[in-house]
Amino acid sequence: MTQPVIIGSERSEVGLPAGMEVLRRGGTALDAVEAAMRRCEDNLTDHYVGTGGLPNAQGVVELDASVMTGSDRRFGAVGALRGFPNPISVARAVMERLPQHCLLVGEGAALFARENGFEGAELLTDESRAMWREQLLTAAEAVEGENTPAVDGDHRYRRAALELVRRMAPHEGPWGTINIVALDAHGEMCVGVSTSGYPFKYPGRVGDSAVPGAGNWCDLRGGGAACTGRGELSLRGGTARTVVDLLALGKEPADACRVALEEAAGLPDEFRSELRALALTPDGRHGGAAGQEGSVYAVMTDASTEPELRPRTLV
């Protein structure tokens, strides 16, 4: 029997104990990842995932999430999902109930969620709405979004929204995506990723969290890896897959993450081009890397009473 392990990115500590409880009972890595991530998505103090996530430039919360299992490389994801608070569960349902597809986005993702009995909810909290309005006022005085009746007001809003996309993409964080990777007692692995994406992003933007090989990759021949940060870079670099390929070649998890991030950092990008990655191997070794000093990840084993923070290797 394999010793179960679960690791997560910054702010996953809210959910990891729920995931480890599943693993202690002999549950699957997939069940553990879903249980842990749902706790994170339901955490109203976290403005970068689930309910309370910061909205797009139009003031609408859009969520991305994915799950992938290591033994068969099954993958399910949703992108730009509106109105459903637990996208990780909808992503799992895509994988299990809609095997002819891997990824649903926008209206199609919401239709699938409704058809499969997921309960809808208002995702924009008062606090997140206030943060959005503050940014609009900072960018253009007295603009109230598309409720503004004047043509000139609408024009100013759209211009401000585009400026917000450009200004907020390189914001100072914390980087919002949550990564969780689990190894169960049967040797199966699962990677889960969930996010509300860049604050005030262009409507419809889908990042690396919903794309296999970019923000999420799991293959028992190497392990599991996930990314957070500048998603457009990991989309271009296939960063999560690169990490796992390096694990399969024998690199230690922290080194594999570092090498993959160094490769992605070499891509030209005018925004803040920092990525973070973490990885777990089928024999339970784990590590992470980041382009910012002081970055950590969280880990729990069967012997843990609470998540332990570990430093990431600096790129």
Q: Can you describe what each PLM-predicted range is?
A:
Residues 1-315:
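Alpha/propeptide regions of enzymes that mature by internal proteolysis
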